[in-house]
């Protein structure tokens, strides 16, 4: 009987230890993800849409403008990685978590493409990306804790706002910048699909002033990231 008790205690201790290891592993995995995202070490799983494209000759001013726009988009993808990871961390259902992680995987492609394009334009990502990441992760956690309907609602609203600003960037890009345009067109199509999928799976409409606050924070990010 005593040996049985000892055996059960040992078994329970092992389970507790394994759970702790799992939590620790998850924390380290998320920290590694944050470092890779902000340091530009995220590989793309899909081919770069601009791989076969060639730019026309651009003036220095046009190159600077394209670089500013692509830096904004790169920072937006840094925020998307943090946001979706935070939301997935506390998602109530496995289905919602799977949707968020799948979207994050496609957004990682966007991140890698924007990073590559910035290098081609002889520019660099925003110096404030670590701060954007931390803030977005915290927002993702907060959205996720409200439940899956609000979680998916946040995805839908985020993607719709990103879709709108990508449309603006496509209009603003120099006509000669064909490679950036090819990237943004695929990104825009992906964002539309992510929003539609969230809406089909029970996304709730976010009440005011949440969408307005999201738009305000996005404007601040874009103003800073365009320059720094």
Ranges and model annotations:
Residues 16-228:
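Non-heme di-metal
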């Amino acid at each position: 009987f005593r040996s049985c008790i000892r055996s059960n205690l040992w078994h329970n201790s092992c389970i507790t230890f394994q759970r702790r290891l799992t939590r620790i592993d998850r924390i380290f995995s998320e920290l590694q993800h944050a470092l890779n995202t902000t340091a530009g070490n995220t590989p793309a799983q899909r081919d770069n849409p601009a791989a076969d494209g060639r730019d026309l000759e651009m003036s220095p001013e046009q190159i600077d403008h394209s670089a500013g726009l692509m830096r904004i988009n790169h920072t937006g993808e840094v925020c998307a990685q943090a946001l979706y990871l935070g939301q997935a961390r506390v998602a109530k259902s496995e289905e919602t978590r799977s949707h968020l992680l799948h979207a994050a995987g496609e957004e990682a492609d966007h991140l890698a493409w924007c990073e590559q394009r910035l290098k081609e334009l002889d520019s660099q990502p925003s110096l404030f990306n670590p701060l954007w990441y931390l803030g977005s992760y915290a927002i993702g956690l907060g959205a996720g804790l409200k439940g899956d309907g609000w979680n998916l609602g946040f995805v839908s609203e985020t993607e719709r706002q990103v879709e709108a600003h990508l449309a603006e960037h496509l209009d603003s890009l120099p006509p000669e910048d064909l490679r950036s345009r090819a990237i943004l067109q695929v990104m825009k199509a992906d964002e539309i699909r992510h929003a539609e999928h969230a809406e089909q799976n029970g996304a709730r409409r976010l009440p005011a002033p949440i969408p307005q606050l999201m738009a305000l924070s996005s404007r601040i990010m874009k103003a800073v990231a365009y320059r720094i």
